[in-house]
Amino acid sequence: MSEAVGIVVALQANYLEVELDQAPEQGLSRLLCTRRTRLSHRGETVHVGDRVRVEAIDPVQARAVVSGVEPRCSWLTRPQVANVSLVVVALAVDQPAFDPDQASRFLLTAERTGLPVQLLLTKGDLMEEHQRFALVERLMGWGYDSLVVSSQTGEGVEVLSQRLKDTELAVLCGPSGVGKSSVLNCLMPHLALRVGAVSGRLQRGRHTTRHVELFPIAPGSRVADTPGFNRPDLPDDPSELGMLFPELRVQLSPWPCRFRDCLHRQEPGCGINREWERFEFYKDALQECSDLSRPSRAG
């Protein structure tokens, strides 16, 4: 076999791991690859999740060279993953404590992809049942049907497993320390992914996942584990923000405002009901977006 097609399942430094659609008669189905120089010359980047063509296959050494990248159907910039079909935002109910502003930032980032979003509440065993119910109801008001899981008790793991098995490529993202790797260990115990504790004073997790990697959860279905980070950026364009809030989005169709450039703060002719929990966060986010989009006067 001189050429083949596969998917990039991991990327570190100058090397890519590619899992072939069809393994060679002799050798492994996963190859350690470099990139052809011409890809860089053409400005073609290669990321985890990309469908690629490989050549110069050495089945004995399990080596090859990536010679081309297939067109992408979707693209996430942070974390950088291609061809995603579901974004799973993982947030802990405690340790670290649930932070509504941080949660909103992650959800806005997920909504910007235009892909389906699943909200996952981890460490469910750390909160009393009535508190969890209240949190789930609160997030329902945000427009999200949350799934509560616990890597300690196994609660919700089977439901999550089925959700992921019905998806071609799901990306699991969220703040550091919310237990993403622990959840994946429950789903696929053979992975034995490294996990870490949450630091005490700042209540932030330590980065135990260092790079993006795809894991097969069922034939034709993969899930991406990603490094955690704690403060996603907001959009540069303030006019983009409103459609990223599901509870506001339902009020925007059909358009209820007098002017097409209404930002739904308190402008004349605005037809939006302001009695929703995240309205204050929305206004603060609008201000931040406006500051980002304003040209700098620094010389």
UniProtKB/Swiss-Prot annotation:
Could you tell me the keywords of this UniProt record?
Cytoplasm, GTP-binding, Hydrolase, Metal-binding, Nucleotide-binding, Ribosome biogenesis, RNA-binding, rRNA-binding, Zinc
- In terms of domain of life, where is this protein from? Bacteria
Instruction: Write down how the cofactor binds this protein.
Output: Binds 1 zinc ion per subunit.
Name any GO cellular component annotation: cytoplasm
Name the Enzyme Commission number(s) assigned to this protein.
3.6.1.-
**Which GO molecular function terms does the record list?**
GTP binding; GTPase activity; metal ion binding; rRNA binding
Sequence ranges assigned to domain CP-type G in this UniProt record: 73-232
Q: Name the residues that span the membrane.
A: none
Record localization? Cytoplasm
Enzymatic class: hydrolase
Q: Where does Zn(2+) bind?
A: C257, C262, H264, C270
Specify which residues bind GTP according to the UniProt entry for this protein.
T122, K123, G124, D125, G174, P175, S176, G177, V178, G179, K180, S181, S182
Q: What is its main location?
A: cytoplasm
PROSITE patterns per the UniProt record, alphabetical: ENGC_GTPASE (PS50936), G_CP (PS51721)
What cofactor does this one take? Answer: Zn(2+)
GO BP terms, alphabetized: ribosomal small subunit biogenesis
Assembly and interaction partners: Monomer. Associates with 30S ribosomal subunit, binds 16S rRNA.
Q: What does this protein do?
A: One of several proteins that assist in the late maturation steps of the functional core of the 30S ribosomal subunit. Helps release RbfA from mature subunits. May play a role in the assembly of ribosomal proteins into the subunit. Circularly permuted GTPase that catalyzes slow GTP hydrolysis, GTPase activity is stimulated by the 30S ribosomal subunit.
By sequence similarity, the record places it as follows: Belongs to the TRAFAC class YlqF/YawG GTPase family. RsgA subfamily.
Query: What protein name does the entry list?
Result: Small ribosomal subunit biogenesis GTPase RsgA
Report the source organism: Parasynechococcus marenigrum (strain WH8102)
